[in-house]
Swiss-Prot record:
Residues where Mg(2+) 1 binds: 379, 383
Protein name: (+)-alpha pinene synthase 1, chloroplastic
A Pfam short name: Terpene_synth_C
Record keyword Magnesium present: yes
Family: Belongs to the terpene synthase family. Tpsd subfamily.
Compartment(s) where it occurs, according to its Swiss-Prot or TrEMBL record: Plastid, Chloroplast
Biological classification of the source: Eukaryota, Viridiplantae, Streptophyta, Embryophyta, Tracheophyta
Record flagged with keyword Manganese: no
Organism: Pinus contorta
SUPFAM superfamilies: Terpenoid cyclases/Protein prenyltransferases, Terpenoid synthases
Domain of life of the organism encoding this protein: Eukaryota
Pathway: Terpene metabolism; oleoresin biosynthesis; Secondary metabolite biosynthesis; terpenoid biosynthesis
Gene3D superfamilies to which the protein is assigned, alphabetical: Farnesyl Diphosphate Synthase, Terpene synthase, N-terminal domain
GO molecular function, one term: pinene synthase activity
Length: 628
């Protein structure tokens, strides 16, 4: 957080220029930043990996300010407004509903004696394959009852050695056991990872044949997927991940380009914690049906694929309307005039759409996009643009939580403050209608804590103080903002979240503490160099180096990444532990938001440099449809 001291604050500060006048003066400054926006015709985007250094500037009020040189909004609002789709027609919804009925009939066949899914030599694997397929194709919300019935059947035959392909197979099967371990664990069933011990040789090692067949490769691929759902202390899962990763990388060097190789590359790259459901669905639609090792009737595969494509494209038509609504909101609040800040509202909305594809969850998607965008504006104010005196005023205004507080704010802050005040109150009131308790006060307290963490960092920078690692992390878990990006959108989802249950997900729960710590640490490993270049010394890496004199920067980064890995296993346990008293589906919302930000920091600070991976994500998941 780079701060500069301003001239002594006086009453004239409350009589600054209007937001738009102030913004106009900044346009000359902003012109030095590369223009990466989508062209008016919406035909191209010019991505850039470069970031200009922080620049000191002086305005007519004599206050030196700094801007970080972030690239501009990538998505021209006219292009968003012109997004078109033919899938709004009722005929597509009617067709999808018809196919849903047909797929339900396929699930029903599982209970028919000697049916296609009930052979005693393959019924368990058939059921697991069906559940896994509808989940990866993004259509599982239509089949909750059928999924539960299928998994109950599989679990009834689960043993300490795993399962075979069928209830009468007699021999355990790696593919079925690995897929079962993963799927059952994710649905809250108690299953031990020790089942994998039975697939090691006498030396305690996983082995493979000299000739890697497609069937064996798929066995190991499911072993890899299972190994990622690891709990703390599960050495067998660590060994399985190491073995399967090595095996699959070796296989990629030998097999020709195919749907299988594409799937392997995708899963090795994104694993589980950076794998967003709609992103995986888009990949899986392309490769589904190419598995020739498992005898499933062609018609069943075609029905699942048809439904997946229909649902993907129908949801696309809803996304179009929601994005247009979000863009209007962005313009109505004057955000385009704030030219010193990042504008990532389209990207944030896309990330929400990638984890919440139920049409009923529009308030969640839009709420996440709005809150995340406003946090980004505040981040750029507190990090670079605001003076210490102005930040004290803004912090005091948030503590008052009153529109009259803007009277003593610089005008460039007034619009931002009112946007936060209006939108958080509006979301909280809507959530209160759903939840039946005072969510407005709850939201206000969470924002006070968030802003308090921001000003604490500002004071550290202003005084030149570098905190200890523990001191930094405790504050950083709050200043990252993941709690407030989760809280209000989650309360609008329609299911009851009484305070008793919410406290198991939100602050001060272990679950919340883990998600906030993971994101703060992961974010810092990608941001600390750019932050340091702007004079923002405090980061998890720098503070760890302070606490451990003589350690190299590379080793410090490795240590922080190791912490993230360990905390991630703890988070897996908090999500899936059977004795929590909170449904997994409730915690999964907060967990998926953690995955969203984890994805954003996978390669770099993807929220500052959004012109590479996240730009491609927007294109693949919300701009383009899939051919039927």
């Amino acid at each position: 957080m780079a701060l500069v001291s301003a001239v002594p604050l006086n009453s004239k500060l409350c009589l600054c220029r209007t937001l738009f006048g102030f913004s106009h003066e900044l346009k000359a400054i902003h012109s030095t930043v590369p223009n990466l926006g989508m062209c008016r015709g919406g035909k191209s985007i010019a991505p850039s990996m470069s970031m200009s250094s922080t620049t000191s500037v002086s305005n007519e009020d004599g206050v030196p300010r700094r801007i970080a040189g972030h690239h501009s909004n990538l998505w021209d609002d006219d292009s968003i407004a012109s997004l078109s789709t033919s899938y709004e027609a009722p005929s597509y919804r009617e067709r999808a509903d018809r196919v849903i009925g047909e797929v339900k009939n396929i699930f029903d066949l599982m209970s028919v004696e000697d049916g296609v899914f009930t052979s005693p030599l393959s019924d368990l694997h058939h059921r697991l394959w069906m559940v896994d397929s509808v989940e990866r194709l993004g259509i599982d919300r239509h089949f909750k009852h059928e999924i539960n019935s299928a998994l109950d059947h599989v679990y009834s035959y689960w043993t300490e050695k795993g399962i075979g392909r069928g209830r009468e197979s007699g021999v355990t099967d790696l593919n079925s056991t690995a897929l079962g371990l993963r799927t059952l664990r994710l649905h809250g069933y108690t299953v031990s990872s020790h089942v994998l011990d039975h697939f090691k040789n006498e030396k305690g090692q996983f082995t493979w044949s000299a000739i890697q067949t497609e069937g064996e490769i798929r066995d190991v691929l499911n072993l890899f997927r299972a190994s990622l759902i690891a709990f703390p202390g599960e050495k067998i899962m660590e060994a399985a991940e190491i073995f399967s990763t090595m095996y699959l990388k070796d296989a990629l060097q030998k097999i020709p380009p195919s749907g299988l190789s594409q799937e392997i590359e995708y899963l090795l790259e994104f694993g589980w914690h950076t794998n967003l459901p709609r992103m995986e669905t888009r990949m899986y639609i392309d490769v589904f049906g190419e598995d020739t090792t498992f005898e499933t009737p062609y018609l069943i595969r075609e029905k699942l694929l048809e439904l997946a494509k229909l649902e993907f494209n129908i949801f696309h038509s809803l996304v179009k309307r929601e994005l247009q609504s979000l863009t209007r909101w962005w313009k109505d609040y004057g955000f385009p005039e704030i030219t010193f800040s990042r504008h990532r509202h389209v990207e944030y909305y896309t990330l929400a759409a990638c984890i919440a594809n139920d049409p009923k969850h529009s308030a969640f998607r839009l709420g996440f996009g709005k809150i995340s965008h406003m946090i980004t504006i505040l981040d750029d104010i507190y990090d670079t643009f605001g003076t210490m005196e102005e930040l004290e005023l803004l912090t005091a205004a948030f503590k008052r939580w009153d529109p009259s507080s803007i009277e003593c704010l610089p005008d460039y802050m007034k619009g931002v403050y009112m946007a936060v005040y209006d939108n958080i109150n509006e979301m909280a009131r809507e959530a209160q209608k759903i939840q039946g308790w005072d969510t407005v006060s709850y939201a206000r307290k969470s924002w006070e804590a968030f802003i308090g963490a921001y000003i604490q960092e500002a004071k550290w920078i202003s005084s030149g103080y570098l905190p200890t690692f523990d001191e930094y992390l405790e504050n950083g878990k709050v200043s990252f903002g993941s709690r407030i990006t989760t809280l209000e959108p989650m309360l609008t989802l329609g299911f009851p979240l009484p305070p008793r249950i919410l406290q198991e997900i939100d602050f001060p729960s272990k679950f919340n503490d883990l998600t906030c710590a993971i994101l703060r640490l992961k974010g810092d490993t990608q941001c600390y160099k750019a932050d340091r270049a702007r004079g923002e010394e405090a980061s998890a890496v720098s503070c760890y180096m302070k606490d451990h004199p003589g350690i190299t920067e590379e080793d410090a980064v490795n240590q922080v990444n190791a912490m993230v890995d360990n905390l991630t296993k703890e988070l897996n346990w908090e999500l899936l532990r059977p004795d929590s008293g909170v449904p997994i589906s409730y915690k999964k919302v907060a967990f998926d938001i953690c995955r969203v930000f984890h994805y954003g920091y996978k390669y770099r600070d993807g929220f500052s440099v959004a012109s590479v991976e996240i730009k491609n994500l927007v294109t693949r998941t919300v701009v383009e449809t899939v051919p039927l």
